[in-house]
């Protein structure tokens, strides 16, 4: 990961904080490497979105509520459905990641920083992208 400034002259943390303040979004945590955003869904459920910064890539990670103690407990039929959905979509993908010792279904999207976050398009694209990803992460 890198902590260098972006082409707009602000650090990753500052850019995320300013952007979220503009949309009245809550930043739970932010560093130069990642940000943790939290939203309240229409169902009143709290949803977390992580934005991880790598050298030239941002990873948007939306963990679902589906978490399992072992690989044996993962419902393979659901995994098959989610893999098929991933194949049908142009943006984002389903995966299983380890979080806190559990196997969690998560929806992710990776994007080159130059193509999204540090461009002017970010001010239009990211709210829609995050909402779209959060909706996809809800079963």
Task: Describe each region flagged by the PLM.
Residues 39-41, 64, 109-111:
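Short beta-strand-to-loop capping motifs
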Residues 93-126, 130-137:
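Well-ordered alpha/beta subsegment
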Residues 6, 10, 72, 115-122:
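Ordered, soluble secondary-structure elements with a strong preference for glycine-centered loop motifs
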Residues 42-67:
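Short, well-structured hydrophobic secondary-structure segments
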Residues 61-104:
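Short, internal acidic amphipathic alpha-helical interface segments
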Residues 19-22, 81-88, 124-138:
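Conserved short hydrophobic interaction patches
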Residues 1-49, 88-89, 97:
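Charge-rich, low-complexity N-terminal segments
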Residues 35, 58, 103-105:
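Hydrophobic residues embedded in beta-strands of well-ordered beta-sheets
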